[in-house]
Amino acid sequence: QPLNIDEDFSFFNPKAGIFWKINNNNNLYASFSVANKEPTRNNYTDNLFAAQPKSERMFDYEVGYTFRKGWFNAGVNLYYMDYKNQLVLNGQLNEIGEAVAENVKDSYRMGIELMAGARITNWLRWDINATWSRNRIKNYTEYLSDVNEDWKDMYSENWGISQTTRYIGTTPISFSPDFMANSLISLDYKGFNASLQTQYVSKQYLNNAHQEDCTLDAYCVSNLNLGYTFKLKGLKSVNVGVTIYNLFDETYESNGYASGSAVYEGHGKNQIKDKDSKLLYTSNYAAYYPN
């Protein structure tokens, strides 16, 4: 698809931080940074109704603590990311099945990250991490495609594609779970190595309208890696291994899309929406698939 766009983006991305080594086992740190991101080509080609996509800007504030002593280490990190014109997925797909993003004027991501690791023996280690977060858009307005009772697109009186706006307010950001956790148990003994990785992801919304019928359910999935390393004449070493994904055969969806429509009274060729058009109901549709 040809594009006739001539835009220049000039960014200043400062970073600053402090680090305090309390002693050999305890450390504190704090940081501030600014990050900018220009729109991608898809952001331009997928932009059917709104103004041209804008670059996004993030102000990132973080503070944390780490502890390390012998066989054990742990840490905690608190963060607040303040966005201007963040490009977020809106749950829709373009004509070739890629996710569509839109600018939202004000939004934020804030949370706490916890991590810990322990070397239980010389050959066995366990690492875990978890993130609790709150990811929100402020003052969000949803744009719904207008259709008639035959589910055909409706048009304005000047034959532009018609849309209905719906003010949502503060709403969760799509594809942004409130809680995630990972566990990794790893073993390395006399050439044999194995690891069990488990991931938990809480519920996610497929769009930014906070609709319970457009969500991905929470899921927990584990993968097992097994390997063995040995020497072979003429070679330094040989490694053979196998990976079993979804070890416990869990059924889950990790991705999907959603679309919404405003259904107005009208049939057949009557596809013009005017001030007298009667809104019958709004409809949401969600579909799911694995990554």
Located regions from the model:
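Outer-membrane beta-barrel proteins
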Residues: 1, 27, 37-43, 74, ...
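Short sequence motifs at beta-strands and strand-loop junctions characteristic
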Residues: 4-12, 53-57, 104-108, 173-178, ...
